[in-house]
Amino acid sequence: MPSTPLRTRAVRRAALPAAVLLPLALAACGGSNDGPMWPPANGAYSAACTGLVANAKLAGTTLATSYVPPDSKRPGGAATGAFLPGHCVVTGSINPRVGVDGKNYAIGFQLSLPDNWNGRFLFVGGGGNDGILRDTSLSSSISGGTPSPLGQGFAVVSTDGGHIGTTASFGADPQARIDHAYNSYDKTAVSAKSLIATHYGRKPDRSYFSGCSGGGRQGMVFSQRFPDYFDAITAGAPAMRVSSGATVAAMWNTIAFNAIAPQDASGNRILSQAFSNADLNLVANAVKSSCDAADGVVDGMVSNTKACKFNPAVLQCSGAKAADCLSTAQVGALTKVFAGPRNSAGQALYAGQPWDPGLAAPGWRAWTLGSSTTATPDARYITLMVDALINEFFTPPDLTFNPLAFNFDTDPARMAAYSAIYDTYADDKLTAFRQRGGKLLFIHGMSDPIFSANDTVDYYERLAANNGGIANTQGFARTFLVPGMNHCSGGPATDSFDSIQTMVDWVEKGIAPDTIAAKALPTQVDYPNRTRPLCAYPQFAKYKGTGSVEDAGSFVCSAQ
């Protein structure tokens, strides 16, 4: 399909289709006409913003507001939606308290309320250990280069997950764990909808959620624990099994790579040097040689992922390590990592990774190997995942734990108690969300080094098995895989796409997405400005046989 420009026009409520006017029976997002009229008389937007603190009806919550006048420059001067509409920024703290560790806690949130409200509400998910408030004036958390939802007229909220700071030290406080698992998202969504109703005089007509990584997990929290809150959810690279699976895989991968890494003068391993960039490029090129043509054309992308049966043994040196081959140890480590972690009985503990050329991209190295030239590693498996493991995922926390000594038979059990409230992999029916008419988009990069796309596909296939098959399940949930994309973005991929507009079209116009238009940004190194259709799983983008490989119009979605 041909590329279409992303929408940047602000959409006013008067332009909304009639389908957005929900019956009052849908309490999660139905409108109500009681309260002040909008817009305020004489354009008194700033005064309305100031008055929101006094008019709000939120117990146990402190609020502050500031008004941003129209045509203010966006932070950083980003090209997409560089100038903002007039809007009221609300910062709030829910249930401020002192934790058992003596630290101050509260569920923080930021809500932007545009003057040109289009009747829609968007919750933007967080990520990592959270602990910061995402700027609600920026693009959605799932794809860079897309229009600012605030600029389009959405009321937009974000939360810090119930603590301040990006480390997982909050894990010492039991309530902070609960807040980060699910409670902060519930409280933020309820508070935001109440403030929207107070400010505009009616509730949102439609409510949407968009998040990636931890934000994708948060989206799944809503689909399972609070299924009436959102009409549609985008769960990008969802961390559905972060504590019970992906973190186990991160330890497995780190141990495998560290074991073959060269040593410094003191005998300490230098993790980043287990594979050079040239080594990873060698592997990526071999993956392309083996699998690229299966989608009908050699274009540097492996779109027919199910047909890719790459074996790194083809790269093994017959003798000493050389530039055009891998050592026996390197082949063994790659084989182990891509197969996924197992215990001593051979039981799989998490999905393996798909073979994809994106493994040579900086985003893959940043998570798995890092770039430190010393024995102090900087891979995100260590700096982020180990921090979460020892502080939050283990019950009780174990601050002296050595990740290189992770026991794959016994240590997963230490994570089970928290996984029960944190992970979102067990509910593979989503009955309540489906019955209320909710729509769900999974979007996942094929070269995500932390949350395997295979794990998302496995969940989706179980979801389909419990809902009458793929065709029936596509009535409310669809999965889109992005060849080459690393974790949420990056890699040799068409990683810019507008999932929010896709949700809006599905919910408000009844247009179920068979494809999502995607493009590579002009600054992308590998394939600048390339366009592709992202195809609803199990289909993939297949070359038609003619036309430029840079143009989405040369491809069609196919299951074989």
Role assignments for model-derived ranges:
Residues 475-490, 521-523:
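Histidine-bearing beta->alpha loop at or near hydrolase active sites
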Residues 24-28:
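C-terminal motif of bacterial Sec signal peptides marking the signal peptidase cleavage site
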